[in-house]
Amino acid sequence: MSKWYQGNGKNSDVVLYSKVRLARNLADMPFPNRMSKEIKRSATKKIYATLKSSEVAQEFDVIDLSALSKIKAVSYAEKQLISADFAKQRETSAFMLSKDEDVSIMICEEDHIKINSFAPGQDLDAAYEKADKIDDIFIDNLKIAFSNKLGFLTASPINLGTGLKASFALHLPALAQSNAIYKLSAMVGKLGLSLRPLYQNGNGDIYILSNQISLGITEKGAIDNANAICDQIVKQERGARDQLKDNFEFEDKLYRTLGILKSARRLDTPEFLNSISLVRLGISLGYFDIEYKTIGEMLYTLQNASLIDSAKTPLTEQMCEKLRAEIVREKID
């Protein structure tokens, strides 16, 4: 079965993917940070049983992190399917994952239920539709914590109300080149959203745009607002890219970067992310005949833990760098 990240969507030159997260809690249990291990296990069984008895049961696998290695758990976090903190709590953690990995459901992380739904490109509606379908199953069969005044009750006050977080992963290399990211981030913040790097130190020029307000606004309102801001950022990034088209020195830099990737025998993670970012930019400018989904698949699968997990054998840092370079050469040759 193909994975969701192997597809393309609207505005894929800038928007890698859309993500909707819904946070829900059981009304008759304390928040996870106040749960004993026994109560947490009981809640996990209750939530899992609800989904297993539903019409979508065959679409999901349950992943018991306590039965997995640390590397396997971290590989799920690298793919944004679970949080990094959740991956560290392997002893009492479990989540459910759809067959093509477009929906994950963390159980007893910060909240009792956290539904994450992905769609390629700019398509929050598709991501929300999938998350909402799962949400309805839980609401119809479990007593979910809800206040007529505040909406859905969550462990963090930030998520009160809809419990919805709408996000985009944006590739913004041209805006990053022109040092416009900080100004853009400040502007976005004034509109109730945030813009932050996906990877450490801004490697890869990929930024996450997400709403920061879920109280006093409807799900549709939050999604429409996020889409409107995303549209503006896409327009700005494309404008900045247009200014690079006739820059011979920059064109040379892009081709040199592709040449390095085609011949490199070792690639550490920062060099990989930054080089792939430039190649992806070169694709959008019409220089390279490589599919966006090829880049997306590499971003999704070539970080250290994912490499080690796919190799099915322990790898040193140097071995990861060697294997990463080998796979990149095969993918873009």
How does the language model describe each region?
Residues 1-149, 164, 178, 182-185, ...:
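Long, Pro/Ser/Thr-rich low-complexity/intrinsically disordered regulatory tracts in eukaryotic proteins
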